[in-house]
Amino acid sequence: MDPLRRETLLAAAAALLLRPFAALAAWNKEAFGAKSAADALKTLGIASPAPSKDIVIEAPQIAENGAVVPIEIQSNIPGTTVLTVVIEKNPFPLNSRFTFREGALPFVKLNVKMGETSAVRVIAQAGARSYTASQEIKVTIGGCGG
């Protein structure tokens, strides 16, 4: 193999391997490490989200196993660019945060881990405003070491 081609391939491979680290730089360690939902939201700059029926949460009312609880979330609020999922009674309440480009469908389907019966709260951000909706899920067998 030509040495120049080998160097080019190695440089391209290194660039691809380092790309995931750029995503880690955006991770908010303080928010995801917060022990209360209020502290996590405060760290994210979310003050008082307004209740909204335009955030749809589809989840089971009762989860037999808290280790895998399926949830679907969709925001019908125009201009939604961020969805944040908070599980109030988990050891680390901030579960996930999704960012969408303008015009994208703000929809996610995920499996979450729940330690006990808790409210699952979703905060949608559209422009400078925040909106929230929640649903309680009863857990019979905890998934966070319970």
PLM ranges: what are they?
Residues 115-119:
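Extracellular Ig-like/FN3 beta-sandwich strand-entry sites
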Residues 136-142:
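Short beta-strand edge segments in extracellular beta-sheet folds
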Residues 89-114:
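An anionic, turn-rich surface loop/hairpin at beta-sheet edges
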Residues 127-133:
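Short acidic/polar inter-strand loop motif in beta-rich domains
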Residues 1-19:
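N-terminal secretory signal peptides and thylakoid transit peptides that target proteins
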Residues 70-76:
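Short edge beta-strand/loop segments characteristic of extracellular beta-sandwich folds
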Residues 26-62, 96-98:
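Transition segment at domain starts
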